[in-house]
Structure formats: structure tokens, C-alpha cells
């Protein structure tokens, strides 16, 4: 585990062992650790940090909540290590600058942000966040994301390529860097439960936000095709 880098964690390539529904060998008779982080009443940061290694880092891509949880843990350690308030950090350093006033990020019972899910904003606010990535991390002349960060987020993660599933990038973005049969040009997106998504399409200077019911999740791809000229 000491060989795991922050970059591996942010590409869902840490190799940390939990069972998750997207695993090829997932046992459907078990309750996934992936969901236990939401429902178990545990300190999710300590739980994720205590999991053993299953694969060498940066060799296998797996969609597992422990990786974004560990990233959030590192952020909390860094923010509080500087003597700053952790719970106002996202609002002060990002949302206020983008004009987002009503973002809600839920926490576990220990006050740790559940950044891997349960983040709520209006469609316009998700579009603001998407536009930050469309403009290479610069907003109103101020660089909010490090130079090269957007390229990192939108580039397919090496471990996922090796694993034969080139669908995940950096910074917890899903990527589609080929024009496939769906006709959607290269894009990357923030994706949530039930088909909630914010898709960034650089070639069209376009951000598309979808917020809706779970029952409409299967129609998202068709809707995107209709929106793109």
C-alpha cells in the first residue's frame, strides 16, 4: 500500500480491496462495501484508509468508492493542517468564485464530506462547474484549477486501458475519447446515480446537464445525440 500515489487514487486505480457491484466477479448475494460507506454508520475516512491492497497500484481500474473517499480524507488533513475550516473550504475556495450559493454536500456522522456522492446543486450550478472545465480551470480571469488539471481529468487512465475498459479518466471523471456508434464526440463527464450527469464536450464548447428520475436514465444517451449538431 505504501506504493499507492495520489494520482492512482484519483484515477480509481489504487488497488485497494473492497467489493463493489461493478466488479466483474461481484457476488450478488453479498452487501457491497461500496454501499456500506453510505449506510454503515462508520467513519468513512478511517474505513477506506484501513482496507488492504488487492492489486498493485496503477495496474487495474476498478470503480470503488474508497478512492474518492481517500481523496477527501487527504483534503481534510491538508485543510485542517493549515488551520483552516474544513466544512467551509469548498464554498470559500470554489463555489463562491463560481457564483454557486446553494450547493449541499452531505457528510457522514463524523462530519466527513461524502464527496463520492450525495452532492446536490441546481442544473445551472452543475453547468457552472462544467464550464470551469470547459475553460481549462480559469474563471473570470482567475485560475482555479492547476494548469494541466483538466487534461489530466479528461485523459483515459492507464490502468483502465490495460484492463480493457478505457472509460475512466482522472479526478473521478468518466471519459469517452472516441467517436463511437452513438455519434457523441469526445467528451468527459461527472456522473451520478440514476443518470444524473454533467457532460463536457470541448469540440462543441458545450456543457450538458441532465437531472431527472432514475426511470429516465436509459434515455440519456439518445437525448445527448439529439442535442449535438
Describe the function of each predicted region.
Residues 1-4, 39-41, 54, 120, ...:
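Extracellular/periplasmic catalytic domains that process cell-envelope and extracellular macromolecules
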Residues 218-229:
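Short, gly/Ser/Thr-rich active-site loops of penicillin-recognizing serine hydrolases
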Amino acid at each position: 500500500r505504501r506504493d499507492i500515489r495520489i494520482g492512482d487514487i484519483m484515477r480509481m486505480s489504487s488497488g485497494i480491496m473492497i467489493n463493489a457491484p461493478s466488479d466483474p466477479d461481484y457476488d450478488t448475494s453479498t452487501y457491497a462495501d461500496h454501499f456500506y460507506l453510505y449506510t454503515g454508520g462508520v467513519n468513512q475516512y478511517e474505513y477506506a484508509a484501513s482496507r488492504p491492497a488487492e492489486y498493485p497500484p496503477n495496474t487495474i481500474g476498478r470503480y470503488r468508492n474508497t478512492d474518492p473517499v481517500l481523496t477527501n480524507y487527504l483534503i481534510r488533513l491538508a485543510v485542517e493542517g493549515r488551520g483552516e475550516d474544513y466544512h467551509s473550504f469548498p464554498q470559500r475556495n470554489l463555489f463562491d468564485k463560481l457564483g454557486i450559493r446553494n450547493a449541499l454536500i452531505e457528510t457522514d456522522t463524523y462530519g466527513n464530506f461524502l464527496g463520492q456522492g450525495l452532492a446536490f446543486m441546481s442544473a445551472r450550478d452543475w453547468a457552472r462547474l462544467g464550464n470551469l472545465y470547459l475553460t481549462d480551470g480559469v474563471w473570470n480571469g482567475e485560475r482555479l484549477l492547476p494548469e494541466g488539471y483538466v487534461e489530466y481529468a479528461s485523459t483515459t487512465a492507464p490502468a483502465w486501458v490495460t484492463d480493457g475498459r478505457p472509460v475512466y479518466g482522472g479526478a473521478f471523471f468518466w471519459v469517452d475519447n472516441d467517436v463511437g456508434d452513438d455519434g457523441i464526440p469526445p467528451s468527459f463527464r461527472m456522473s451520478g446515480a440514476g443518470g444524473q450527469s454533467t457532460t463536457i464536450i470541448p469540440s462543441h464548447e458545450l456543457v450538458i446537464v441532465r437531472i431527472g428520475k432514475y426511470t429516465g436514465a436509459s434515455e440519456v444517451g439518445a437525448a445527448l445525440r439529439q442535442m449535438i449538431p
